[in-house]
């Protein structure tokens, strides 16, 4: 009974139209059933991943000091909708997120008319979309020379990301990914309280997450082959933020497969 597009009015209309009937709350029932993807769904997600890569490649070429952020947002949409080869692009469920400087201390911020500036960090959270299937992908760009604390955080984050990917195996728990990520961060003196991922697949606005399993220490859900997640260990600190993420597939054996294939690092220009 809890859904973006199932309103209180819709519920009362059903009750009035079907007197004497009992309605059972089946919130998220369908979401749980679609957690394991078919071969065709995975093919769609791999095509979406090629679009995600194209978007990030374009950002690495175009982002420079003095370029207005809205122009970069427009280029993201252009790459997303033009697609790659036979994978035409659809509109993603979430708009491009690209906060810079102190704005990057918080997730989920979009853009304005300001220009990119020397000495600022920007993370880009985007996703290609093919036949409504998504593969979110985040990378971070620093214009200039990054400070030492940001470089130390990058190193710990990448170490945690690699550890989490190795822990993302069939039979392990969602919590195992979160705990693997947390260990290098804790050694670096970084506390991170937020979840670090969620299931993905087919979606419409306003969200590309499936709202079921949550990659956090408290979630003991068992990982199964065919499950797909956005593993997104972002850091949002007092006056900066960094995101280096991967969309992943739980395989029959071995660690997770990443849908996208780009260096796991903060790009410096």
Model-identified regions with their sequence ranges:
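Active-site neighborhoods and metal-handling regions in enzymes and metal-associated proteins
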Residues: 1-269
């Amino acid at each position: 009974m809890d859904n973006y597009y199932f309103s209180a009015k819709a519920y009362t209309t059903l009750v009035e139209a079907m007197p004497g009937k009992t309605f059972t709350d089946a919130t998220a029932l369908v979401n749980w059933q679609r957690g394991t993807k078919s071969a065709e769904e995975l093919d769609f997600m791999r095509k979406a991943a090629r679009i995600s890569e194209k978007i990030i490649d374009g950002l690495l070429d175009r982002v420079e000091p003095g370029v207005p952020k809205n122009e970069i947002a427009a280029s993201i949409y252009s790459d997303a909708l033009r697609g790659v080869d036979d994978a035409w692009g659809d509109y993603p469920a979430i708009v491009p997120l690209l906060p810079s400087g102190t704005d990057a201390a918080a997730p989920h911020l979009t853009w304005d008319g300001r220009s990119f500036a020397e000495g600022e960090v920007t993370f880009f959270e985007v996703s290609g979309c093919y036949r409504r299937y998504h593969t979110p992908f985040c990378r971070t760009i620093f214009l200039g020379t990054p400070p030492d604390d940001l470089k130390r955080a990058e190193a710990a984050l990448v170490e945690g990301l690699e550890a989490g990917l190795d822990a993302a195996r069939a039979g392990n728990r969602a919590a195992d990914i979160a705990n693997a990520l947390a260990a290098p961060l804790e050694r670096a003196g970084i506390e991170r309280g937020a979840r670090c991922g969620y299931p993905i697949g087919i979606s419409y606005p306003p969200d590309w997450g499936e709202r079921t399993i949550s990659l956090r220490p408290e979630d003991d859900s068992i990982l199964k082959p065919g499950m797909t997640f956005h593993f997104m260990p972002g850091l949002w600190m007092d006056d900066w933020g960094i995101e280096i993420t991967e969309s992943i597939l739980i395989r029959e054996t071995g660690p997770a497969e990443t849908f996208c294939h780009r260096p796991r690092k903060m790009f410096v220009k």
